[in-house]
Amino acid sequence: MKTIYCLLAAAAVLAVLVGCQAGNTPAALNSNTNAESANNTNAMKFPYHLTEDEWRKKLTPEQYHVLREAGTEPAFTGQYWNTKEPGVYRCAACGAILFKSDDKFDSGCGWPSFSDIMAQGKVITREDYSYGMHRTEVLCANCGSHLGHVFDDGPAPTGLRYCINSASIQLQDTNTPGWNTDKTAEKK
């Protein structure tokens, strides 16, 4: 009996851990949403870009791994996975406003989940076939940094779940003066 409980517990943990790693590619993203598609961000020019050495100096090791190497932080460990604080979420690499707390919801996957992006053109997407899966990767449209993935199992009205790494975003209180000013700077 103890073995059965251990197996059930292990299966439950595994299901949670892969919650943001698998899913259907959102059909809505392939046709029309607030995201713009890109097939190869390495060849793209972004308004804000640094050399990889500059990124390493600017970001923490965890941020660099997630944002620049398309890494994933462990589930239920990130700073924002369960926060309910109001505000906007900015790209941790360049400061672009990406998401608002009104669109954040508890998906149970262990990463911050949003049903929509702040505005059209804030993120871009590309197909991701890593780890033997087909997913849709989400990147900052301003600097090309990896944010997470988007799936088609989110709440109405969008039906989308933007599963985002905490290390890739920073929460800013909207009661702070100047919260909505563009903190990004073009670096060429």
Question: What do these predicted regions represent?
Answer:
Residues A9-L14:
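Hydrophobic helical h-region of N-terminal Sec-dependent signal peptides
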Residues V16-G19:
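C-terminal motif of bacterial Sec signal peptides marking the signal peptidase cleavage site
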Residues T25-A27:
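Post-cleavage N-terminal segment of exported redox proteins
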